């Protein structure tokens, strides 16, 4: 039996085919436009890029470029994938916790490491996953990915810090401001250890809350000058302004009693002038660039870049305050040890 197609049915079929073809071509054109259109950040009511949200620094990239990678500023795709595989193989949830740069150097050495002296009291299970990047150092200037030489005063400060590390303190004043829960220091380079930030933004101010010791930096954007250099603060005196889509924050007037940057592989004192740049480069990424200008500690300024990732969780309370019961326990235990050794 032969079925005949009516002129109306034939016309309808041709129309459907044309519509389908048009849809495919339209989708292709839209895809091409999407691919060629650069990503644009969400904006606040005053038209500035929104930096708001909870961000974390769990980068595995070390501050300085390791000696084994001295001539390799970036890993290839294959090398990066190999590094990620090694991390999965070498570190399990039961492994001792490894913080900061320790993870990267353990992978290069191809053997586990411990961030707490193999005490077994703190495992990887309690740490967030680290993310790997092609770069082999956070430092981008100097170009070799290394910290510049320290000044004579800087070397003296480094040796003094090493000499006091691990030595029982005679009083609370001899303990670090971190142990005393006064201030942890920033930029926070100790990745994966409560390295989370919350940013809140208005047309006139930006507030950056740090998870450690729940410090909050309140940064005015109205062009006011810095306070008198006679006034020194643990968080320094910050002033911000916008350069295009980048928030620039300049901080000075740091307190002399303590290391503003927390002492993690770095040196800093009250003469530190810190310039930070915050730029949202993707929906889940905030590019954080900072330049350290501290002429009494370093022979030249240096710059590093860290990619903060948007956190899937909230910033939790850091229950730490000066006078914390742990401080009394540490000091009394040290005195008991001294008495027992006499």
Q: What residues fall within each predicted segment?
A:
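PEST-like low-complexity, intrinsically disordered acidic/proline/serine-rich tracts
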Residues: 2-342
């Amino acid at each position: 039996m032969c079925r005949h197609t009516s002129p109306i049915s034939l016309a309808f079929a041709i129309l459907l085919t044309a519509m389908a073809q048009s849809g495919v071509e339209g989708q292709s054109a839209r895809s091409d436009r999407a691919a060629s259109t650069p990503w644009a950040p969400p904006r606040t009511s005053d038209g500035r890029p929104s930096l708001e949200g909870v961000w974390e620094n769990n980068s595995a990239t070390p501050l300085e470029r390791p000696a084994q990678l001295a001539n390799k500023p970036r890993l290839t795709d294959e090398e990066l994938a190999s590094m990620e595989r090694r991390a999965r193989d070498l570190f399990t949830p039961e492994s001792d916790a490894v913080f900061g740069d320790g993870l990267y150097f353990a992978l290069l050495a191809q053997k586990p490491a411990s961030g707490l002296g193999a005490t077994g009291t703190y495992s990887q299970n309690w740490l967030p996953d680290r993310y790997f990047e092609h770069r082999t150092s956070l430092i981008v200037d100097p170009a070799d990915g290394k910290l510049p030489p320290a000044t004579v005063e800087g070397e003296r400060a480094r040796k003094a810090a090493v000499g006091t590390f691990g030595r029982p303190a005679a009083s609370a004043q001899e303990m670090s401001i971190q142990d005393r829960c006064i201030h942890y220091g920033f930029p926070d380079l100790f990745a994966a250890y409560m390295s989370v930030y919350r940013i809140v933004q208005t047309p006139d101010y930006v507030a950056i809350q740090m998870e450690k010791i729940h410090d909050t930096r309140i940064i005015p954007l109205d062009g006011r000058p810095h306070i008198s250099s006679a006034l020194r603060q643990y968080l320094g005196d910050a002033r911000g302004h916008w350069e295009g889509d980048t928030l620039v924050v300049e901080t000075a007037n740091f307190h002399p009693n303590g290391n503003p940057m927390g002492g993690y592989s770095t040196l800093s004192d009250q003469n530190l002038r810190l310039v930070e740049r915050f730029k949202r480069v993707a929906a889940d990424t905030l590019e954080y660039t900072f330049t350290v200008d501290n002429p009494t500690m370093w022979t030249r300024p240096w710059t590093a870049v860290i990619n903060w990732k948007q956190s899937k969780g909230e910033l939790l309370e850091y229950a730490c305050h000066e006078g914390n019961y742990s401080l009394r326990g540490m000091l009394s235990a040290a005195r008991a040890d001294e008495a027992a050794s006499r």
